[in-house]
Amino acid sequence: MDLTSKNYLKWVANKRCIYHGTAETVVPHHIRSLRLGAGMGIKAPDINTIPVCHECHTNCHNGTIDLETQLMWCLQTINNALAEGEIQYG
């Protein structure tokens, strides 16, 4: 998968919130971290995206939901994408 993928972002946006399980107002949240190849002025790769509701999106940005939790959710999202054939390994 390329670093940017509109199809993957659309797929993420159509999922339920990874934490609350709600389907209303789900937005793709890019996990931004210098360790993950993103930071100030640098967009995170789309593979580092998780489906979250507005509340969780706010909490990801304000630090209430820590980076470790976001990364765990990212792995779950990638596993789901692999299982559904949205992305392929290799």
Predicted regions and their residues:
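Generic signature of intrinsically disordered, low-complexity segments enriched in small/polar residues
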Residues: W11-N14, T22, S33, C60, ...
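Short cysteine-rich loop/turn motifs with clustered Cys
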Residues: D2-H29, E55
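Short recognition patches in nucleic-acid-associated and regulatory proteins
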Residues: E24-M40
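Processing junctions and N-termini across compartments
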Residues: W11, I47-I50
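Polybasic, low-complexity binding patches
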Residues: G37-N48, T58-G90
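Short, intrinsically disordered, charge-biased short linear motifs at domain edges
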Residues: M1-L9, G37-A44
